[in-house]
């Protein structure tokens, strides 16, 4: 089954070579680049060239790149110097997307108001919303130049105020929605209703499961997420790429923290991910 998996299913820093090889051996032919998804790391040309060689060697097609809102460099920072640095960081990932010939999107986190935020925090996040609009305005010409898209992701506990506004304000041919099933399912603030409303804007997916208690990134059909509902939504959506699964072996029964070599655990985890992911892909095709 032609489905994709994230590169950081065990760790999101250091060399991904082992994880690319194991994913390929498990039958995956597509990946989402997810290393350094929450750092200020800038990929230099020698690193991108090395990644390109690995992808060719392991017969892997890059689908999406998970961008980063950074630590100090942040595309929605209210401090202008940090925001501009965040735009440069985003451009780095956009160029990486094109250099590695990805056929998907650049996935980015927007600012979000969480259900537990007080008034002062909400005021700050709304200012961050204005910052991210300035960043998107600066990035749109590059998206046009490279014929690329940014997918804005629904985030845990977010109330959708900013995400829905951005999707309403920006053109669908450049700015879309990355649907994250695990974030949708967290019971503190489920996202089922809003996700269905914006199904026509889905251009990327992060598929994983949990029990509703937190962002566990477990294999499909191991938690409480409503996969039958999602199959129906995706059938009616604008999404056309192969399904992408964003998983974490460390939060599954396959992981043994006492082990010094996790290779066999990862092989079992990936085999299970392939079986469960393919099962859901068949549901979407039925």
What are these model-predicted stretches?
Residues 1-3, 13-27, 137, 145, ...:
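Histidine-acidic metal/acid-base catalytic patches
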Residues 17, 54-57, 75-176, 264-269, ...:
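Active-site acidic/histidine proton-transfer and metal-coordination neighborhood
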Residues 1-16, 45-51:
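N-terminal-biased segments
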Residues 6-10, 34-38, 67-70, 110-113, ...:
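Active-site beta-loop-alpha junctions enriched in small/polar residues
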Residues 32-56, 109-113:
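Glycine-rich, proline-tolerant flexible connector loops at the mouths of alpha/beta enzymes
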Residues 3-7, 31-33, 62-67, 104-108, ...:
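Hydrophobic faces of well-ordered beta-strands that scaffold small-molecule active sites
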């Amino acid at each position: 089954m032609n489905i994709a998996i994230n590169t950081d299913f065990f760790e999101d820093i250091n060399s991904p070579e082992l994880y690319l090889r194991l994913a390929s051996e498990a039958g995956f032919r597509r990946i989402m680049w997810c290393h350094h998804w929450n750092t200020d790391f800038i990929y230099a040309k020698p690193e991108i060239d090395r990644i390109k060689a690995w992808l060719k060697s392991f017969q892997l097609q890059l689908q999406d790149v998970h961008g980063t809102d950074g630590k100090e460099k942040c595309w929605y920072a209210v401090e202008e110097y940090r925001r501009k640095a965040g735009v440069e960081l985003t451009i780095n990932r956009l160029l990486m997307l094109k250099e590695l010939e990805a056929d998907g999107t650049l996935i980015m986190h927007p600012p979000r108001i969480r259900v537990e935020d007080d008034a002062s925090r909400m005021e700050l996040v709304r200012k961050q919303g204005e910052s991210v609009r300035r960043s998107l305005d600066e990035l749109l010409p590059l998206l046009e130049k490279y014929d690329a898209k940014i997918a804005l992701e629904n985030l845990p506990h977010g109330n959708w105020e900013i995400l829905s506004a951005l999707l309403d304000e920006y053109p669908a041919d450049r700015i879309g929605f990355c649907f994250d099933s695990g974030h949708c399912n967290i019971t503190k603030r489920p996202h089922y209703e809003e996700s269905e409303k914006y199904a026509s804007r889905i251009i990327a997916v992060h598929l994983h499961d949990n029990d509703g208690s937190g962002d566990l990134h477990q294999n499909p059909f191991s938690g409480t997420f409503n996969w039958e509902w999602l199959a129906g939504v995706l059938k009616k959506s604008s999404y056309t790429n192969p399904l992408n699964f964003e998983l974490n072996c460390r939060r599954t029964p396959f992981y043994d923290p006492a082990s010094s070599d996790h290779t066999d655990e990862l092989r079992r985890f990936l085999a299970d991910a392939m079986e469960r992911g393919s099962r859901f892909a068949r549901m979407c095709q039925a």
